[in-house]
Amino acid sequence: MKNYLLQIEYFGKNYCGWQRQSHSLSVQEELEKALSKIANQNIEVTCAGRTDTGVHATSQIVNFYSNAYRPLSAWQRGVNALLPQDIKILAVQQVNNNFNSRFTAINRTYNYIIYNSATSSPIFAEHCLWENRELDIDKMNQACEYLLGEQDFSSFRSSQCQSNTPFRNIQKAEFIKQGSFIVFEVVGNAFLHHMIRNLVGSLLKVGLGFESPEWIKVVLEAKDRTQAAETAKAHGLYFVGVEYPEFSFKRQIIKLFC
């Protein structure tokens, strides 16, 4: 039995998220269906981070076990031929049998993309959140300082979150402006359900001048979801990287745009 790692890219618009669901089409279902056909046996996969409905990935990491002998090219080109255009395998490699894409991960990186322009873009409309008002990046980054370290993020978790603990460790949270794009990059050991989109929604209020940077600290300490802003839309969020003890994978979405 061999353990294989896949690096996956997908556009999440047409899916209910990563995780297999009985009522809707998921990325996991499409990938397992294609892998199972190539392997001629049932294949189940594990992913580094389960993305929600409409969320994308440039570097999702998946692993699966199979005793079917196939060259690595078959696991990539053969499976890609069976996958829809909005899901593709970028790379494949054999890994140690102890490797688990979810539980071996040290941290995960997400990008949230904002298109900050007076006029919306027909090309990027489904890839970014459009904000026509000017955003104060400096104040947003000041607010990000309050997010760093291990903290209780109850104020930024959804009511449907099933995690046993609201504590998460954020190593990086930063906004970077590149032309008309503003990229929020956040790195953490793990994230709560809707956590990043809830953070973005609140940080936008700071950037628009409705709240001060210190307001984020007040919201955090409240441990109350109703004190934070509304959830930012899903289509601006991308899973872009994972770090493991032996290696890391990262493909920043803005580098694909520019």
UniProtKB/Swiss-Prot annotation:
Residues that span the membrane, as ranges: none
EC number: 5.4.99.12
CDD domains: PseudoU_synth_EcTruA
GO biological process: tRNA pseudouridine synthesis
Catalytic site: D52
Domain of life: Bacteria
Gene3D superfamilies (alphabetical): Pseudouridine synthase I, catalytic domain, C-terminal subdomain (3.30.70.660), Pseudouridine synthase I, catalytic domain, N-terminal subdomain (3.30.70.580)
Catalyzed reactions per annotation: uridine(38/39/40) in tRNA = pseudouridine(38/39/40) in tRNA
Keywords: Isomerase, tRNA processing
Subunit structure: Homodimer.
Stated family: Belongs to the tRNA pseudouridine synthase TruA family.
Name listed for the protein in its UniProt record: tRNA pseudouridine synthase A
Organism field: Francisella tularensis subsp. holarctica (strain FTNF002-00 / FTA)
